[in-house]
Amino acid sequence: MAAPHRGNTGSGTYFITASTFQKQQLLQSERMARLFLDVLLNYRSQEKYLLHEFVLMPDHFHLLITPLLTLERALQLIKGGFSFRAKKELGFQGEIWEKSFYDRRVRDWQEYCAFRQYIQRNPVQRCLVLIPEDYPYSSAVPGLVLDAVPQRLKPSELSA
């Protein structure tokens, strides 16, 4: 079966889920997790996308992202950039990611808040921490500043 064609440009905000190859817990080591965060934040600083929320779990990641390129290119940079560096810098051999990813366009403020809460609560739901702020590989970490909610998603009382 062919992969779905996505023609998404940078005009939307998306909830993303991508899994490791065969759901292996490849991202549970601190070295792999820190490298992933470095790649994720590096491409953000290069203005390839706006990053609103994220969590890196042992076998997958979730993002709330507004691509400034196409969605496909943003995910190619993240997944491909991480794979390249993991193999080069950490000597990893083998497949890291499943080929596809799940995306859902965020339509409104309520969806944005629901996805944000889901991302922040994911480590708690998986019994990795008691509160989201204690999980070191997420945007819930105190003091981490990410990109603001896109204006088009804000309710009118927050837009003013």
Q: Where on the chain are the PLM-derived regions?
A:
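Short catalytic/metal-binding and nucleic-acid-binding patches
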Residues: M1-A160
